[in-house]
Design a protein with these regions (language model features):
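C-terminal "cap" of GNAT-fold acetyltransferases
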Residues: 3, 134, 141-148, 154-157, ...
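Extreme N-terminal starter segment of soluble prokaryotic enzymes
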Residues: 7-10
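Acetyl-CoA-dependent GNAT
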Residues: 16-17, 24-99, 103, 108-109, ...
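Conserved acetyl-CoA-binding loop-helix of GNAT-fold acetyltransferases
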Residues: 107, 113-126, 149-153
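Short coil/turn segments at alpha/beta junctions that flank glycine-rich nucleotide-binding fingerprints
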Residues: 114, 130-134
């Protein structure tokens, strides 16, 4: 694992010449447990269950019209670079509910745990505050415990659960909705 300081990282908005870098951050990640949500007295809480064996999962590369994320008022994609290598990204949109919705956040495997995700979230938060949005939201599958732990560490709270959205996937029991409200 490399060591990275914030001074070494450049966060760049998407430009046409950077489109080829978008999928470079889509590495596999470990699925080692799941979040089990509970709703009581109007509040969400959760427990963690660890799996006996971890497995590697990789999402397919998104096939989008990336030009739409360049110089747009209501969506953006930011790429994180170290020594001209793309090591992370965050893709965001202004949602109907006045939240900045994170469509995707990813850090290359070798750079996880070094603050890249935090830097990208800070960039998204700045973008959202410039637009006077209420906060940031995202969704994660219940079996992506590593990501859910990261979101909690970054100040997100569980705001909802959908048990039908991923019905086609027998591995996923629930989609979890996470929120970070601005004060």
């Amino acid at each position: 694992m490399n060591s990275t300081s914030a001074e070494e990282i450049i966060i760049s908005p998407l430009k046409e010449e950077l489109i080829e870098d978008i999928h470079k951050t889509n590495d596999s990640f470990k699925v080692f447990g799941k979040v089990v949500p509970s709703f009581q007295s109007g509040k969400w809480s959760f427990e963690e269950i660890l799996f006996d064996e971890a497995k590697d999962v990789r999402f397919p590369d998104d096939q989008l019209d990336w030009i739409e994320y360049i110089d747009s008022e209501d969506k953006a994609l930011f790429l994180a670079y170290k020594n001209n290598d793309c090591i992370g990204q965050i893709r965001i949109v202004q949602d109907w509910n006045r939240f900045c919705y994170i469509e995707n956040i990813a850090t290359k495997e070798d750079f996880r745990g070094q603050g890249i995700g935090s830097l990208l979230l800070t960039k998204a938060e700045d973008w959202a505050k410039e637009r006077n949005l209420l906060g940031i939201s995202l969704e994660a599958q219940d079996d992506n415990l590593g990501a859910c732990r990261f979101y909690v560490k970054q100040g997100f709270v569980l705001g909802g659960v959908d048990t039908l959205k991923q019905s086609y996937n027998p591995q996923i029991d629930a989609t979890l909705y996470w929120y970070k409200l601005f004060k």
